[in-house]
């Protein structure tokens, strides 16, 4: 689902998918479908296309009953059949709690009780039959038009409001976000042994902060992105950086190398 894509790039994707014995379909919604929305935050790196996430029930054919949505800053490292087979009876989506779920401001701004928590919309197993029956797309449009001042994190806020009573949470391994690898963030984890196992062996890895293609990314599993990139037609491509940026990167790393500053990320070998 995209506003547009060149025929050349469509063919590259068709060939890649066909090499694994599958096919791919492209959906290009009308330009005015998202006219009622606006980008509220991260406008320099997020386009209006993010709101397609709210409109899948209007975009996709009626015979599509379920969708696994994944952000583009994600690598799938293992079998997702367990996640795909999650029971979605009576709910709109299966999702994973956001690393920022404990920020009271979110619930005050969005006007729902924090006991329902807040999910990260980068990984969503969507029950499209439920969305059509409950007109989730229209609910998103109506909420944005009525309360635009409440929306900060774009479509993620909208979906959390509309689905706050109608979702099911699944384990972190299905959306292991950047913040869970960082020091200095209260993760409020009940079972640290289980949490550590999920950190070491995530199934869906989500680079929610610095992207692995950013030259200054410090993510401990950054290499996983390039491992899978090198299995595509874009094999060998790496971020380009000027001499100035490379020097800045070295200077940025020095305090961590000489342990003048505590590392940002956990050492997964500890």
Protein language model features and the residues they cover:
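Conserved glycosyltransferase catalytic-site signature
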Residues: 50-54, 121, 152-157
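GT-A fold catalytic core of metal-dependent nucleotide-sugar glycosyltransferases
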Residues: 30, 34, 49-102, 125-126, ...
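Active-site-proximal specificity loops/subdomain of glycosyltransferases
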Residues: 8-58
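Short internal beta-strands
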Residues: 1-4, 95-96
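Short, charged/polar "capping" segments at the starts of alpha-helices
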Residues: 4-11, 103
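Short, surface-exposed amphipathic charged segments that create phosphate/polyanion-binding patches used
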Residues: 37-48, 107-112, 184-189
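Conserved catalytic core of nucleotide-sugar-dependent glycosyltransferases
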Residues: 85-143, 156
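A glycosyltransferase accessory/donor-loop signature
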Residues: 126-270
